[in-house]
Amino acid sequence: MPSISINITLAFTTALLGMLMFRSHMMSSLLCLEGMMLSMFILSTLIILNVQLTMSFMMPILLLVFAACEAAIGLALLVMISNTYGLDYIQNLNLLQC
């Protein structure tokens, strides 16, 4: 495994651990999720270019589209929660109430 793949995999696991450790704040969770999506994009691009799969060149672009949708929905939820409750602590909120 080349060193760039090891570094990207390490970045993914670091973002995953950050998401598990800093899950009390929504903004920290969103940043870690974006780091995970970025490392998945780079790793999938490298794998597709190394294996030369011509049929799956659109997969990283599709991953970026889903990452942009996830970021927009996450930021909209963050704004809604901070306007309603005045903070972004996830542990203090009961999001299942209507």
Curated annotation (Swiss-Prot):
It catalyses: a ubiquinone + NADH + 5 H(+)(in) = a ubiquinol + NAD(+) + 4 H(+)(out). Its EC number is 7.1.1.2. It holds the Pfam family Oxidored_q2. It is found in: Mitochondrion inner membrane. The keyword Transmembrane applies. It is a multi-pass membrane protein. Keywords: Electron transport, Membrane, Mitochondrion, Mitochondrion inner membrane, NAD, Respiratory chain, Translocase, Transmembrane, Transmembrane helix, Transport, Ubiquinone. One of its GO terms (cellular component) is respiratory chain complex I. One of its GO terms (molecular function) is NADH dehydrogenase (ubiquinone) activity. Belongs to the complex I subunit 4L family. Core subunit of respiratory chain NADH dehydrogenase (Complex I) which is composed of 45 different subunits. This is NADH-ubiquinone oxidoreductase chain 4L. It comes from Mirza coquereli. The lineage of its organism: Eukaryota, Metazoa, Chordata, Craniata, Vertebrata. The gene is MT-ND4L.
